[in-house]
């Protein structure tokens, strides 16, 4: 009898193999404290009363208290089905719904309603679309910028966490021309295990996307997830390669397994190693680094953007 995933489909062989390893027990340092400040409480009430949806609350992000206190939030676009499968990601792989061309406008309205200082837009890969979803990502940035142009506290800044669009120059250009304050593309892991963890992507292609974004003049960002089988030396090498590719901002985090169908946790990285990696990344030359067990790629995103801009200003003096 074939193993069946929760969504009713037949499980992939990789998922069956992953399922043979029970969910790992988290160490004591993988925990967070709820610090509900006044801005967080306002945001929580607003999201509930207006029926808004953010990745922050729907994914149970441990950093929601800090981010919402800073009036920062993350939105997922493109639907809930991805055309690629990464072995760490909880988003389902399958055939997406038809493109919702009104979604960018609605996301913009949500940003206005929440009065955000900084919005991170992420989404699924849409290889089913002729443009890979490039218009959708670009239009969402445009809508947020247009709808918040008259905001008293200043236009909402947008960070776009995008797929690679197969590194097609025309598609990347369309996205870049929407001028997000930050263009993020996450490599997530090191070259040796990249194909196993992210079979739909290519490491060198991801580096090229980051280089192209930097050459276009955008602030660039990426993320590394630790605990999926990489070595300490490989992390250091990946950091150097990312910086050489033009990456300015980096987040480094611990892999937390979403379910038994996903890649097992190979190791729990101790807090001290995250401290050491932060220092190493800063020495390599990254403008801003967030490194810790519960850091996520959108964690303190506005603060990291500020670090990049400060570094750029210093370089021109």
From Swiss-Prot:
Annotated catalysed reactions: [[Fe-S] cluster scaffold protein carrying a second [4Fe-4S](2+) cluster] + N(6)-octanoyl-L-lysyl-[protein] + 2 oxidized [2Fe-2S]-[ferredoxin] + 2 S-adenosyl-L-methionine + 4 H(+) = [[Fe-S] cluster scaffold protein] + N(6)-[(R)-dihydrolipoyl]-L-lysyl-[protein] + 4 Fe(3+) + 2 hydrogen sulfide + 2 5'-deoxyadenosine + 2 L-methionine + 2 reduced [2Fe-2S]-[ferredoxin]
Cofactor binding, per record: Binds 2 [4Fe-4S] clusters per subunit. One cluster is coordinated with 3 cysteines and an exchangeable S-adenosyl-L-methionine.
GO molecular function: 4 iron, 4 sulfur cluster binding; lipoate synthase activity; metal ion binding
Source domain of life: Bacteria
InterPro entries from the UniProt entry: Aldolase_TIM, Elp3/MiaA/NifB-like_rSAM, LIAS_N, Lipoyl_synth, rSAM
Radical SAM core domain: residues covered: 68-287
Binding site for [4Fe-4S] cluster 1: 56, 61, 67, 298
Cofactor(s) in the UniProt record: [4Fe-4S] cluster
Pathway given in the UniProt record: Protein modification; protein lipoylation via endogenous pathway; protein N(6)-(lipoyl)lysine from octanoyl-[acyl-carrier-protein]: step 2/2
SMART domains to which the protein is assigned, alphabetical: Elp3 (SM00729)
PANTHER family per UniProt: LIPOYL SYNTHASE, LIPOYL SYNTHASE, MITOCHONDRIAL
Protein name according to UniProt: Lipoyl synthase
Organism: Streptomyces coelicolor (strain ATCC BAA-471 / A3(2) / M145)
Taxonomic classification: Bacteria, Bacillati, Actinomycetota, Actinomycetes, Kitasatosporales
């Amino acid at each position: 009898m074939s193993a069946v995933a929760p969504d009713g489909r037949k499980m992939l062989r990789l998922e069956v193999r992953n399922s043979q390893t029970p969910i790992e027990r988290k160490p004591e340092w993988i925990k967070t404290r709820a610090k509900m400040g006044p801005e967080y409480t306002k945001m929580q009430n607003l999201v509930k009363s207006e029926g808004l949806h953010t990745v922050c609350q729907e994914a149970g992000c441990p950093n929601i208290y800090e981010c919402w206190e800073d009036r920062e939030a993350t939105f997922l676009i493109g639907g809930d089905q991805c055309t690629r499968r990464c072995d760490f990601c909880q988003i389902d792989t399958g055939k997406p719904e038809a493109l919702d061309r009104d979604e960018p406008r609605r996301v913009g309205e949500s940003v206005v309603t929440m009065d955000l200082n900084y919005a991170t837009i992420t989404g699924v890969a849409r290889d089913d679309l002729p443009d890979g979803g490039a218009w959708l990502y670009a239009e969402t940035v445009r809508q947020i910028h247009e709808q918040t142009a008259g905001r008293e506290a200043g236009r909402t800044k947008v960070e776009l966490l995008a797929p690679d669009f197969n590194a097609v120059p025309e598609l990347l250009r369309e996205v870049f021309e929407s001028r997000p304050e930050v263009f993020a593309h996450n490599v997530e892991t090191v070259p040796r295990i990249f194909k196993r963890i992210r079979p739909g992507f290519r490491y060198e292609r991801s580096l090229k996307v980051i280089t192209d974004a930097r050459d276009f003049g955008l602030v660039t960002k990426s993320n590394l997830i630790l605990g999926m089988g990489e070595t300490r030396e490989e992390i250091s090498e990946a950091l150097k390669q990312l910086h050489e590719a033009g990456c300015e901002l980096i987040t480094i985090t611990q892999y937390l397994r979403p379910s038994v169908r996903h890649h097992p946790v190979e190791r729990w990285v101790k807090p001290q190693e995250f401290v050491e990696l932060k220092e190493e990344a800063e020495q390599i030359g990254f403008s801003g680094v967030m490194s810790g067990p519960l850091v996520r790629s959108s964690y303190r995103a506005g603060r990291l953007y500020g670090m990049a801009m400060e570094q750029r200003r210093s370089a021109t003096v």
